[in-house]
Amino acid sequence: MKRPFISRERLKQITETYPTPFHLYDEAGIRQTARALHQAFSWNPGFKEYFAIKATPNPAILKILKEEGCGVDCASYVELLIAQKLGFTGQEIMFSSNNTPVEEMVFARQLGATINLDAYEDVAFLQSVATLPEVISCRYNPGGVFELGTDIMDHPEEAKFGMTKEQLIQAFTELKDLGVKRFGIHALLASNTVSNDYYPELAKQLFQLAVEVVEKTGVTLDFVNLSGGVGVNYKPEDKPNDIAVIGEGVRQAYEDILVPAGLDQVKIYTELGRFMLAPHGLLVTHVTHKKQTYRTYLGVDASAVNLLRPAMYGAYHHITNLDRPDGETEIVDIVGSLCENNDKFAKNREFPVSEIGDLLVIHDTGAHGYSMGYQYNAKLRSAEILLEESGQTRLIRRSEKPEDYFATLYGFDFEK
């Protein structure tokens, strides 16, 4: 059973000020996770977490993470702009993009961000649009399938990201000859893994690659970036990842592979988004309708506009009825109001018998929740609210208004 980070009584008070639906974030939980991550990798003096802005691009959240010693991982011009406006500078910014527009690459160089090249062809592209930096990273794709034990976790061969080993070695060789001084290796081989073994296994593969690359090219290896991929237990029956165990697993691989090769100064970087934020966000919504046809439908005032993952991926998010957490249950679909049949937060789910007006929370929406929102059916994006450590709430993004929707249109006068 998942428990919200806020009591029913306190949340009821908040809904008296802010109408549902809205996203609510827990500052205390965010800080706790950031500190646990840094403790887990404290054995590596150069460790740095680059929070993936794409997961939760709200300045208030990013400021909290900056205070906790995190950098940011950016993948677009506006994400770079957010980082700049918040005071992230130079190598506090990791720029991991693909099919990168010229203006984005140029801006990343202007900011002094560490650039993570996605393709071998980007070596020539970067030279053609900007000067080469002293430090650069290349993204590795091993191809094939990625396995943990007997489980297939993902299919890197199908991913559009990264370069082959041969391409990476060639890129390092050329970049070294062109004057680049220090190098990094980056890879993401699976997403949302709920396993303490993912990072250690990834680390083994990248550390072995690092040793081979250094031997063949003679480059100075500055860091290995494990990227993201460490997930959260969206289903309550799944055991959550233990970041302390994960950090120790990476340390053991580091001691076994890099240290004997004389690479004991290599820094470890991560680009966690989901792990850092997902458990510390709730989508708060009310039951607005109840319908009985071939199924029982609970209609809520949130929709896929507010949380796209279930509609796009069929992703599971646990849902709690705070007004009726226990008691008799029924099988329901919990749905929004979009004109799309995939606008469903839950399908055929056993759920407490609910009534119109009941207060529900959808769990683990702190990452890839608001950020994946859109405006289909001319729906307006909801507010974001921060539950501060003091227990007070702060509006960190207001809900959209109709005039926001019309603001970018020409030839239409909203005021008439």
Residue positions per predicted region:
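Structured core elements
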Residues: 71, 94, 114-116, 137-139, ...
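Active-site loop/helix belt of alpha/beta enzymes
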Residues: 142-288, 351
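Glycine-rich, aromatic-flanked loop segments that form ligand/cofactor-binding clefts
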Residues: 131-145
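Generic secondary-structure signature for well-ordered alpha-helical cores
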Residues: 35, 39-43, 128-131, 173-181, ...
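Conserved, mostly hydrophobic/aromatic
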Residues: 30, 54, 76, 108, ...
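Charged (often Lys/Glu-rich) extended helix/loop segments that serve as interaction or gating elements
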Residues: 258, 263-416
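A charged N-terminal "starter" segment
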Residues: 1-115, 120-134, 177, 181, ...
